[in-house]
Structures are given as C-alpha cells and as structure tokens.
Amino acid sequence: MRRLLFVVPLLLLAPACNEDSPANATCGKKPLPDCPTQKWMKENMKPALDQENGPKLAQAFETVATHAPAGYAGWDAIAKKGADAARANDIAGVKAACKSCHDDLRSRFKKELRDKPLF
C-alpha cells in the first residue's frame, strides 16, 4: 500500500514532465490553443501538403525561410530546400525537408519560442 501511495502521485505528474511541454505552457497541447507557428503550419503548410499543391507549398516554405529565428542555423536552408522540392512537385523531397527541420530544430524551438509568433 505504501508503494502505491508513492507511485500514484508520480504517475499523475509524469505528463507535466514532458521536455517539449513546459509546465507553464500557454499553448500547444489540448485543451490549450495551438501555438502561433503550430497554428500557421496547420492553416498553411498542412492543407498544401495534403493537396500536394506545389505552388502553395513553395510559397509556405519561402515564408518559413524568410522568418528564420536568430540562432537557428540551417532553418532557412532547410526551408529553401523544401521550396525547391515543392516547385519541382517532389512531394517526397518536401516531406524530407519537413522531417529534417522537425528532427533538427523542433524540440529546441518548442522549448524556446513555441509561444512567439514568427509570421
């Protein structure tokens, strides 16, 4: 019984310990609203990708490239690579650019800038 009394509070706190989700988060996880960049991605990048719309994807990637946060090396290069792939209607290349940015930069971005609008 003692062990159960110790473990249950830890289990209840575990979701708040997610490194990508600060305890004082004001956006990004339900029931909170989407964060500014998350909202923009859902409204612009996702529909264009779902429709495989090369011109809209290229435009979205160009917007991302021109709004690279200071200190995020590679952000603009990844976005420009995505824009080039979109212009070539290379959806696999587009997805690779998305994955590259998410793998390299998303975790840090979520910790440092998730609640700040970029666009």
What spans do the regions from the language model cover?
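Extracytoplasmic c-type cytochrome modules immediately beyond a signal peptide or single-pass transmembrane anchor
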Residues: 17-100, 107-119
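Sec-dependent bacterial lipoprotein signal peptides
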Residues: 1-15
